[in-house]
Each structure stands twice: as structure tokens, then as C-alpha cells.
């Protein structure tokens, strides 16, 4: 870039020197003095810019790429150093672990904390389980309504199995009838007696015949 700037300055200085030299020759023509100076200066500037752009493009194609690449590498080094992550900071837990507690004590403390947390959780779980068991155990025990219905059904079933007063009375009456029929019937007994007397009378001595 510095070389390109120096070339541009040299070209501009040469062009300006030529312009002023030509202006001295044109002093005899005062009408075209102002237009001639500005016109020539403008032409010279445009030509100088065109030449400098061409020279800059040629230098860039020849070796500017390598220079540009070197500049990038040189710029990347400080950027990489600047973007590098900071060194890892020592953790607070590591300090406590190294200074105050040994590995066994640290593990023991961790186990105690874990048991404490899980113990509260297990106690709550045990209380909930006990409550559920009580709820489930209540219907498993004697239900007063169900027990009362069962007792009433058993009484109903037990009543016909025992002596029914009406049925027992009918059975007793039938038994009395059967016993009465089995025993001596007074009417039938009287008829039988009379027939026996009739039969026994001719068998014995007839008082008239006798």
C-alpha cells in the first residue's frame, strides 16, 4: 500500500508540473486561461487515477496476495491470543475437598446427606402407604351394615330350621289324629263289641230253646 501511494504521488507531481508548464505557454490567451487550467488538471487527475489503479491491480495480482496473506497471518496471531479462553478457575468445591475433607470424609458426608433426603421421602411414602392400607383394611374388617344383614339372613335361615310354631302345631294335630285313629275308636269299638255279642249269643245256650 505504501508503494502504491508513493507511485500515485509521483505521478500527480509530474502531471501538475506539466500542467503548470503548459499554463505558462498559454498566458498569451487570457480568455481560455481558466478553462485551460481546470480542464488540464482534471484530465491529468483522471489519467493519474487510472494509471494508479492499473498499477495497484498488477501489484496485487503479482505478489500482493502473498503479502495480504502474510498480513492476515500476522493479524491472526494477536487475535488468537486475544480470543483464547481464560485459564480454568479453581472450583470452590475442589478447594474445600482438598483443604478440609479427605475423600472418605467427603463421601461419608455425601452419603449422610443423601440418606437424610431419601429418609424424609421414604417416611412420607411410608405414611401414605399406611394410610392407603388403613383405607383398604377398613372394608376388609367387619362391616357393621354387611354384618347386620348377614346376621339377619342367618336368623331367617335359622328360624325355618328350628321349630316353626304354626308348622309344629299342624304336625302335632296330624300326629294326634294318627294316634287317635291308631288307638281304639269308641264308635268302631262299640260296633265291634255289639257284633261280638251277636255272634256270641247263638254260640252260647239259648234261653228260650234251653
UniProtKB/Swiss-Prot annotation:
Residues 115-210 are annotated as: Disordered. GO terms for biological process: cell differentiation. A- repeats lie at residues 127-135, 148-156, 169-177, 190-198. Residues 21-83 are annotated as: Required for secretion from the host cytoplasm to the host apoplasm. It is found in: Secreted; Host cytoplasm; Host extracellular space; Secreted, Extracellular space, Apoplast. Keywords: Apoplast, Differentiation, Glycoprotein, Host cytoplasm, Repeat, Secreted, Signal. GO terms for cellular component: extracellular region; host cell cytoplasm; host extracellular space. InterPro entries: CLV3/ESR. Residues 136-210 are annotated as: 4 X approximate repeat CLE. The keyword Ribosomal protein does not apply. CLE- repeats lie at residues 136-147, 157-168, 178-189, 199-210. Disulfide bonds: none annotated. Residues 125-137, 144-158, 165-179, 186-200 have a biased composition (Basic and acidic residues). Mimics host plant CLE extracellular signal peptides that regulate cell fate. May play a role in the differentiation or division of feeding cells (syncytia) induced in plant roots during infection. This is CLAVATA3/ESR (CLE)-related protein 4D. It comes from Globodera rostochiensis. The lineage of its organism: Eukaryota, Metazoa, Ecdysozoa, Nematoda, Chromadorea. The gene is CLE-4D.
Amino acid at each position: 500500500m505504501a508503494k502504491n501511494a508513493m507511485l500515485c504521488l509521483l505521478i500527480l507531481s509530474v502531471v501538475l508540473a506539466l500542467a503548470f508548464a503548459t499554463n505558462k505557454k498559454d498566458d498569451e490567451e487570457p480568455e481560455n486561461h481558466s478553462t485551460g487550467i481546470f480542464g488540464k488538471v482534471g484530465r491529468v487527475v483522471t489519467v493519474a487515477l487510472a494509471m494508479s489503479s492499473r498499477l495497484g491491480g498488477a501489484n496485487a495480482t503479482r505478489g500482493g496476495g502473498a503479502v495480504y496473506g502474510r498480513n492476515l497471518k500476522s493479524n491472526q496471531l494477536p487475535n488468537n491470543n486475544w480470543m483464547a479462553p481464560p485459564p480454568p478457575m479453581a472450583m470452590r468445591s475442589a478447594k474445600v475437598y482438598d483443604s478440609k475433607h479427605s475423600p472418605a470424609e467427603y463421601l461419608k458426608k455425601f452419603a449422610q446427606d443423601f440418606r437424610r433426603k431419601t429418609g424424609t421421602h421414604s417416611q412420607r411414602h411410608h405414611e401414605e402407604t399406611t394410610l392407603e392400607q388403613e383405607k383398604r383394611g377398613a372394608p376388609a374388617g367387619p362391616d357393621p351394615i354387611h354384618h347386620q344383614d348377614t346376621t339377619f339372613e342367618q336368623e331367617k335361615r335359622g328360624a325355618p330350621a328350628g321349630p316353626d310354631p304354626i308348622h309344629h302345631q299342624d304336625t302335632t294335630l296330624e300326629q294326634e289324629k294318627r294316634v287317635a285313629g291308631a288307638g281304639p275308636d269308641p264308635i268302631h269299638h262299640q260296633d265291634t263289641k255289639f257284633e261280638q255279642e251277636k255272634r256270641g249269643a247263638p254260640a252260647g245256650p239259648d234261653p228260650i230253646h234251653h
